[in-house]
Protein backbone atom coordinates (compact mmCIF):
# COMPACT_ATOMS: atom_id res chain seq x y z
CA UNK A 1 0.00 0.00 0.00
CA UNK A 2 2.83 2.37 0.82
CA UNK A 3 4.41 1.86 -2.61
CA UNK A 4 1.11 2.73 -4.33
CA UNK A 5 0.84 6.05 -2.49
CA UNK A 6 4.46 7.04 -3.07
CA UNK A 7 4.66 6.22 -6.80
CA UNK A 8 2.39 9.04 -8.05
CA UNK A 9 4.09 11.55 -5.79
CA UNK A 10 7.52 10.55 -7.06
CA UNK A 11 6.31 10.86 -10.66
CA UNK A 12 4.95 14.32 -9.99
CA UNK A 13 8.24 15.42 -8.46
CA UNK A 14 10.16 14.14 -11.51
CA UNK A 15 7.77 15.94 -13.86
CA UNK A 16 8.18 19.20 -11.97
CA UNK A 17 11.96 18.89 -12.14
CA UNK A 18 11.84 18.40 -15.91
CA UNK A 19 9.49 21.34 -16.39
CA UNK A 20 11.72 23.53 -14.22
CA UNK A 21 14.76 22.74 -16.36
CA UNK A 22 13.09 23.35 -19.69
CA UNK A 23 11.09 26.48 -18.92
CA UNK A 24 12.71 29.78 -18.13
CA UNK A 25 12.42 31.21 -14.65
CA UNK A 26 9.37 33.28 -13.77
CA UNK A 27 11.57 35.60 -11.72
CA UNK A 28 14.42 36.97 -13.84
CA UNK A 29 17.70 37.80 -12.18
CA UNK A 30 18.06 41.41 -11.00
CA UNK A 31 19.77 43.55 -13.59
CA UNK A 32 18.80 41.30 -16.51
CA UNK A 33 16.43 42.78 -19.09
CA UNK A 34 13.63 40.91 -20.78
CA UNK A 35 14.50 40.80 -24.47
CA UNK A 36 10.85 40.93 -25.52
CA UNK A 37 10.40 44.45 -24.04
CA UNK A 38 13.01 47.09 -24.76
CA UNK A 39 13.78 49.68 -22.06
CA UNK A 40 11.96 52.51 -23.86
CA UNK A 41 8.77 50.46 -24.12
CA UNK A 42 8.88 49.64 -20.38
CA UNK A 43 8.71 53.30 -19.42
CA UNK A 44 6.01 54.23 -21.93
CA UNK A 45 3.52 51.41 -21.25
CA UNK A 46 1.09 52.66 -18.54
CA UNK A 47 -0.58 49.23 -18.21
CA UNK A 48 2.63 47.54 -17.15
CA UNK A 49 3.18 47.31 -13.36
CA UNK A 50 6.01 49.24 -11.74
CA UNK A 51 8.98 47.13 -10.75
CA UNK A 52 9.68 47.33 -7.03
CA UNK A 53 13.44 47.13 -7.49
CA UNK A 54 13.48 50.25 -9.67
CA UNK A 55 10.88 52.21 -7.69
CA UNK A 56 11.53 54.86 -5.07
CA UNK A 57 9.96 52.58 -2.42
CA UNK A 58 12.90 50.20 -2.61
CA UNK A 59 14.51 49.96 0.87
CA UNK A 60 17.89 50.77 -0.63
CA UNK A 61 16.57 54.19 -1.60
CA UNK A 62 13.91 54.94 1.03
CA UNK A 63 14.43 55.68 4.71
CA UNK A 64 12.36 57.17 7.51
CA UNK A 65 14.41 60.33 7.20
CA UNK A 66 13.04 60.83 3.70
CA UNK A 67 9.45 60.78 4.95
CA UNK A 68 9.63 62.49 8.32
CA UNK A 69 12.90 64.39 8.28
CA UNK A 70 16.11 63.59 10.10
CA UNK A 71 15.25 65.07 13.51
CA UNK A 72 11.47 64.61 13.46
CA UNK A 73 9.65 64.56 16.80
CA UNK A 74 5.98 64.99 17.55
CA UNK A 75 5.20 68.37 19.11
CA UNK A 76 4.61 68.27 22.88
CA UNK A 77 1.18 69.85 22.52
CA UNK A 78 0.03 66.73 20.61
CA UNK A 79 1.61 64.16 22.95
CA UNK A 80 0.96 65.72 26.37
CA UNK A 81 -2.89 65.82 26.33
CA UNK A 82 -3.15 62.18 25.29
CA UNK A 83 -0.61 61.08 27.89
CA UNK A 84 -2.37 63.03 30.67
CA UNK A 85 -5.76 61.62 29.68
CA UNK A 86 -4.48 58.03 29.76
CA UNK A 87 -2.80 58.51 33.15
CA UNK A 88 -5.98 60.06 34.59
CA UNK A 89 -8.09 57.18 33.21
CA UNK A 90 -5.84 54.55 34.78
CA UNK A 91 -5.85 56.35 38.15
CA UNK A 92 -9.66 56.69 38.03
CA UNK A 93 -10.07 52.97 37.24
CA UNK A 94 -7.86 52.05 40.19
CA UNK A 95 -9.40 54.41 42.77
CA UNK A 96 -13.13 54.22 41.94
CA UNK A 97 -15.59 52.35 44.12
CA UNK A 98 -17.07 49.02 43.08
CA UNK A 99 -20.33 49.42 41.17
CA UNK A 100 -23.21 47.15 40.17
CA UNK A 101 -21.54 46.61 36.80
CA UNK A 102 -18.44 45.24 38.56
CA UNK A 103 -20.57 42.87 40.63
CA UNK A 104 -22.43 41.71 37.52
CA UNK A 105 -19.17 41.10 35.64
CA UNK A 106 -17.75 39.16 38.59
CA UNK A 107 -20.89 37.01 38.64
CA UNK A 108 -20.79 36.42 34.86
CA UNK A 109 -17.10 35.51 34.86
CA UNK A 110 -17.66 33.19 37.81
CA UNK A 111 -15.10 34.78 40.10
CA UNK A 112 -15.32 34.06 43.79
CA UNK A 113 -15.55 37.13 46.05
CA UNK A 114 -12.43 37.97 48.00
CA UNK A 115 -12.30 36.28 51.43
CA UNK A 116 -12.83 38.37 54.53
CA UNK A 117 -10.03 39.00 57.06
CA UNK A 118 -11.26 36.49 59.68
CA UNK A 119 -11.23 33.53 57.25
CA UNK A 120 -7.51 34.06 56.66
CA UNK A 121 -6.66 32.95 60.20
CA UNK A 122 -4.84 29.59 60.13
CA UNK A 123 -7.16 27.84 62.62
CA UNK A 124 -10.36 28.32 60.61
CA UNK A 125 -11.44 25.46 58.33
CA UNK A 126 -12.19 27.83 55.42
CA UNK A 127 -8.59 29.01 55.35
CA UNK A 128 -7.36 25.40 55.49
CA UNK A 129 -9.52 24.39 52.50
CA UNK A 130 -8.39 27.44 50.53
CA UNK A 131 -4.72 26.46 50.92
CA UNK A 132 -5.14 22.84 49.79
Curated annotation (Swiss-Prot):
UniProt-annotated location(s): Mitochondrion inner membrane
Q: Which residues cross the membrane?
A: 79-95
The keyword tRNA-binding is assigned to this record: no
Where is it chiefly localized? mitochondrion
The record's keywords, sorted A to Z, are:
Electron transport, Membrane, Mitochondrion, Mitochondrion inner membrane, Respiratory chain, Signal, Transmembrane, Transmembrane helix, Transport
Job of this protein: Required for the assembly and stability of the mitochondrial ubiquinol-cytochrome c reductase complex (complex III (CIII) or cytochrome b-c1 complex), a multisubunit transmembrane complex that is part of the mitochondrial electron transport chain (ETC) which drives oxidative phosphorylation.
User: By what name is this protein known?
Assistant: Ubiquinol-cytochrome c reductase complex assembly factor 4
Q: Which gene encodes it?
A: UQCC4
Amino acid sequence: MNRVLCAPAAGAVRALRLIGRTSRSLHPLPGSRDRAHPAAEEQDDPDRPTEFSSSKANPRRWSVGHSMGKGHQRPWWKVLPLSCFLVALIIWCYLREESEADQWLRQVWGEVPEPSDRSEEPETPAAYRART
